[in-house]
Regions:
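Terminal, non-globular segments
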Residues: 1-171
């Protein structure tokens, strides 16, 4: 049951990200719903479930992107690992912590993408433009992350209310 809910959310997020979010592009930047969901899984899944969820989300995104295989798997897996470890030490709830942590994860994701793509391919990027775009990416992800965290929390509460047994409690 947990796997079915997880798959439905992942399919929905990738559908929205690939079809609808291009309309809301700012300076060529769109929010990365997969990264936000990896952070959410790391912060809310029990034990180390966020690591596996981040790796699966990143691998699916790598397969759908057609670019270098492994960049998203690494970055989303690291986001899941970071927040799986961090959730026991810091409460990841509220406006400011969620925004800060998603912004940090976005910068980490952008740096991983930049380092791997420039070292493995002949891609070149201007550092000034890259820094501005990464900063815009982080701010845009933070804003979208607040909305997505809210929607995912409401969905989790609704599922736990409708199915009051212990089947979905690890979510």
């Amino acid at each position: 049951m947990i796997l079915c809910v997880f798959l439905l959310v992942v399919i929905g997020l990738f559908s929205v990200q690939t079809t609808l979010l291009e309309v809301f592009s700012l300076w060529g930047t769109t929010p990365d719903l997969a990264l936000i969901f990896a952070v959410y899984c790391g912060a809310h899944f029990q034990r180390n479930g966020g690591i596996g969820a981040g790796i699966i989300i990143g691998f699916v995104q790598d397969c759908l992107s057609g670019g270098l295989l492994g960049i998203n798997t690494l970055s989303k897996g690291l986001a899941g690992l970071f927040f799986s470890v961090l959730k026991d030490k810091i409460v990841v709830e509220g406006f400011i912590p969620i925004s800060f942590f998603i912004f940090t994860a976005s910068l980490l994701d952008g740096m991983i993408y930049f380092v791997i793509s420039t070292s493995l391919t002949a891609a070149q990027a201007k550092e000034g433009i890259l820094l501005i775009r990464m900063f815009a990416f982080g701010i845009y992800n933070s804003a979208a992350g607040l909305l997505l965290f809210y929607l995912l929390d409401k969905g989790r509460q609704w599922i736990n209310h409708k199915i009051p047994n212990q089947v979905l409690r690890p979510l």
